[in-house]
Design a protein with these regions (language model features):
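Bacterial Sec-dependent N-terminal signal peptides
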Residues: 1-32, 390
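Contiguous segments within soluble domain cores/interaction surfaces
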Residues: 26-47, 52, 58-59, 63-103, ...
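Surface-exposed, low-complexity/disordered segments
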Residues: 40-44, 55, 59, 80, ...
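Short beta-strand and strand-turn-strand segments in soluble, beta-rich domains
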Residues: 44-48, 88-99, 229-232, 313-318, ...
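Internal, hydrophobic beta-strand segments that form the core of beta-sheet-rich folds
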Residues: 67-68, 88, 125-133, 347
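Ligand-binding face of N-terminal immunoglobulin V-set domains in extracellular IgSF glycoproteins
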Residues: 111-115
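Short, surface-exposed beta-strand/strand-loop-strand elements in extracellular ectodomains
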Residues: 225-227
Length: 668
């Protein structure tokens, strides 16, 4: 339906451009670019993953349960592309300590992660989810969620004491995560980032510049911002929602200073991005509840030049047109009811088809068909049943998790609606995303616009989608479960081409599977497996000319994305005053008058107190026990997985000390 709509718009604007007599060169590039966008989405559609969890924080020893939804963005529906979902548990330092695969059926999957002995210390752990196909794009494309994992309570059931370890370099723990945003200019007390609207400052043209002010930990700051040239203040502004704000600035080629002063009196100076002598400036007004207004101006040397623009949502063309630049620029209005809800993107291109400016804006959704209502009751009491009335679209499924609001841990309140409509199209962590979808009024529209300007990462790269930049597809789309990789020579006399492989898999229940394959001219192979669950052991054999021949068999399974930087707001704990765990006494009346046999009812047993602990008869055996050692450790290295990765790459196996020194510089 969306493709048909795009084609109709395409033909419509063809005749509009022709009748208006606008630049035929710009129109020709518009025609080519819209066609390239359609082709890109047809052959390389993107996916989004959302995980719905049962809680907002966990204790060591518990289990993280989740329901996964995989969405195809070009059709805004559950995906029919990928069949395998990867879910990872990542330590605060960025080590992936657990990776599981789950079968995606009709765009959905479900599963769990056990917080067992692999979780050595409490801390803020990250759960990531992605399909292999998604790793062809930036690591910002994948799903990511940070959870506090607390120490196991000393008294079972007492969750009021939540103890969590702080990540400290005094403990000589390495950090494999990305550093903070490279665009951020870090100083002692104040960090400031500046974003010209549309992407560039142009001399002689007034631009809107968004800014984001925070402290060295990433916490938002209230501050005043001054633009100073020489000894004169030419403009000033101040922060608004969450340390963000706007200023209007007209560069003239002379250097200016930016002075930022916070509420405590601390101040620092910064520089704005360099201005261009020639170019375009885009200004977008989103405050009208009915429409979005775009105004494009250019430097005088570009008067008479043709430009074209494309409005897209999820990479799909919604509107397109051309214009000829003049002294007054060009203005276009886009009606909100003709645009899709969520994050939309305006891309401006010159008469040669190059992207010269772009801008994100948010369109508030008004269609809310999913509702959950709690039946009215005189009072809510512990262990009392509550009736829920739920409404959703027909022929759909949904998941539901219920928890005590007073036991919320890190204040995380995002749902699938905020993820799909907002945060999955933006860069980094979005604090309180539900705020932007709360009301469609001037205050919320302005806050959402500030968010678009400072965290507007481009999930859909229009330079790439229009053919201006090459897309490299490194990983395949897994429409089934595959084993693929490459053979590496052990002896040079044995070529890796046309080698027969046979694989045998077996599990603890005694089931077996077998498969065969042949390598290509470069030694690559792939074998398709039927769906299977739990752990399986695989044995692989290689034959050359029907004789067993030794090769190093590499498996392509190391495509885990780069670990991102964890935002300050993701590691904040909501205080809890008291425990909210209740037990029904044995003689308390049931809420239901329906007779339930004794063996079908739940029974509250008396608390059992442990008076003694087992003492090892052989102390050395206890000391050498791996599980006992892991319990007292601060770092965990899965040497077996590391050895597999080295073998898969065809590299020589290093000595343990050399490997540790490379893995962790503190071992040097």
């Amino acid at each position: 339906m969306k493709t048909k709509r795009s084609l109709i718009l395409y033909l419509f604007f063809f005749f509009v451009s022709f009748l208006n007599g606008q630049s035929q060169t710009a129109f020709q590039h518009l025609k080519e670019n819209v066609g390239n966008i359609l082709a890109f989405n047809k052959y390389l559609p993107q996916e989004k993953v959302y995980l719905h969890f049962d809680n907002t924080g966990y204790f060591k020893g518990e289990t993280i349960w989740f329901k996964a939804y995989v969405v195809r963005t070009d059709k805004s529906c559950l995906s029919d592309l990928s069949h395998v979902l990867y879910v990872e548990l990542v330590t605060p330092g960025g080590d992936v300590i657990d990776t599981k695969k789950f079968c995606i059926k009709d765009g959905e999957a479900d599963g769990y992660l056990k917080l067992d002995d692999k979780v050595l210390e409490s801390g803020f752990y990250e759960v990531r989810a992605y399909t292999r196909y998604m790793t062809n794009w930036d690591n910002e494309c994948i799903f990511s969620r940070v959870f506090p994992i607390f120490k196991k309570p000393n008294k079972e059931g007492d969750y009021s004491k939540r103890v969590i370890a702080e990540h400290s370099y005094v403990q000589r723990l390495p950090d494999y995560r990305e550093s903070a945003d490279t665009l951020k200019v870090k100083v002692k007390k104040i960090n400031a980032r500046f974003y010209p609207e549309g992407g560039n400052l142009v001399q002689g043209l007034t631009s809107t510049v968004a800014f984001d002010i925070c402290d060295e930990d990433g916490a938002h700051l209230a501050a005043d911002v001054y633009v100073i040239k020489g000894t004169d203040t030419i403009t000033r502004s101040k922060t608004e929602y969450q340390g963000r704000g706007l200023l209007r600035y007209t560069p003239d080629g002379e250097a200016c200073r930016i002075l930022v002063t916070d509420s405590s009196g601390h101040h620092r100076e910064f520089s704005l991005p360099e201005s261009l002598q020639s170019g375009y400036v885009m200004t977008v007004n989103t405050q009208n509840p009915k429409s979005v207004l775009m105004h494009v101006n250019s430097s005088p040397d570009l008067y008479g030049k043709g430009v074209c623009w494309v409005v897209t949502h999820n990479g799909i063309t919604e509107s397109a047109d051309t214009a000829t630049m003049g002294a007054d620029g060009t203005i276009r209005q886009f009606m909100r009811d003709q645009l899709e809800p969520g994050v939309n993107q305006i891309t401006l291109m010159d008469d040669e088809g190059h992207v010269v400016a772009d801008r994100l804006f948010f369109n508030y959704p008004h269609d809310q068909s999913d509702t959950i209502n709690i039946a009215s009751s005189t009072a809510l009491s512990p262990c009392k049943k509550v009736s829920l009335d739920m409404k959703s679209l027909s022929h759909t499924s949904f998941s539901l998790s219920i928890r005590d609001v007073e036991t919320e841990t890190n204040g995380y309140n995002q749902d699938i609606r905020t993820w799909l409509l907002l945060t999955s199209d933006l860069k980094g962590f979005i604090e309180n995303p539900e705020y932007y979808l709360g009301e469609d009024d001037a205050l919320h529209r302005h806050a959402a616009d500030l968010l678009m300007l400072v965290q507007g990462w481009r999930r859909y790269d229009m330079t790439m989608m229009t053919g201006g930049k090459k897309f490299v597809k490194r990983e395949p789309l897994e429409d089934a479960l595959y084993i693929d990789g490459r053979l590496h020579q052990v002896k040079k006399k044995n070529p890796v081409s046309q080698v027969s492989l046979s694989a045998t898999l077996y599990n603890a229940q005694g089931y077996t599977m077998t498969g065969n394959g042949v390598t290509d001219a470069n030694g690559y192979y792939a074998m398709k497996l039927p769906d299977c669950e739990d752990e399986w052991t695989m044995l692989m054999y290689t034959k050359k000319n029907n004789e067993l021949t030794k090769y190093n068999i590499g498996i392509d399974r190391h495509f885990s994305p780069q670990r991102r930087h964890i935002n300050y707001a993701e590691t904040q704990i909501t205080p809890i005053d008291k425990s909210n765990l209740f037990f029904r006494s044995g003689d308390e009346a049931s809420d239901s008058s329906v007779f339930v046999p004794m063996d079908k009812r739940n029974h509250v047993l008396k608390e059992v107190k442990v008076k003694g602990h087992h003492i090892f008869e052989n102390a050395r055996a206890g000391w050498e026990n791996e599980r006992n050692g892991a319990y007292r450790s601060s770092m965990y290295y899965n040497c077996a997985d590391a050895a597999d990765e080295i073998a898969d790459k065809g590299e020589d196996m290093p000595e343990i000390h050399d490997w540790l020194s490379k893995r962790n510089p503190f071992f040097e």
